[in-house]
């Protein structure tokens, strides 16, 4: 809960106010603002954790406010790192702290940048969600800057993604769709690479042992076109649930293994066809 004190003082007809005038005022009362998390926030945070996404709070609010919000959405707040303590830490100390601590309070925009940078240097892919002026530097520093439609214009301009709904559940859906798209994209790359490798291997073998060229360049292009037409359905292909449970990095090693495994199998069918052509020609 945020509390603002309201006070008054009779200034007469004075037009210019100076800091010294802000003394001897009469307290009228307090205004209390309680910005409760949405009812769906707790479930959304739990869903992000199941997807191996570690939610962290980076806020300029006081420690008590940050802890109160985290307790309501079940984000670990046993240890809170403040901006003052962060300034005293070396880069190596901060690098270890960002792995263990999930709540950072009383931060300046520069301190938010430092935290995001530390997470990225540790090998994490960082998505930063913010809607205020103070969040703009961190939005630019993160791998993916995320804002909402009701944010200030500058924050929306700095963000890579603007959510049309102020709901963390949208993030869960976006992550799932992104992982499905990534998986299907890998399928296309693997299929295409294996096909091309198999074609090259077949042509090399044919050139070494056959007195004629069994496949022309036009026929190879036609085969690739047919492959691409078949791959049009890949965006709608089913993705196994285990493929979406954790983030995946692009790795050329898996592509190489797949290509070396399935490319020769494709070539084997080509070679059998070539041998049939040789037999047919001799007969």
PLM segments and residue spans:
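Cytosolic catalytic headpieces and adjacent flexible linkers of membrane translocases
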Residues: 1-118, 122, 136, 142, ...
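Conserved catalytic-loop aspartate of Hanks-type protein kinases
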Residues: 131
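Membrane-embedded transport module
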Residues: 77-128, 142, 147-283
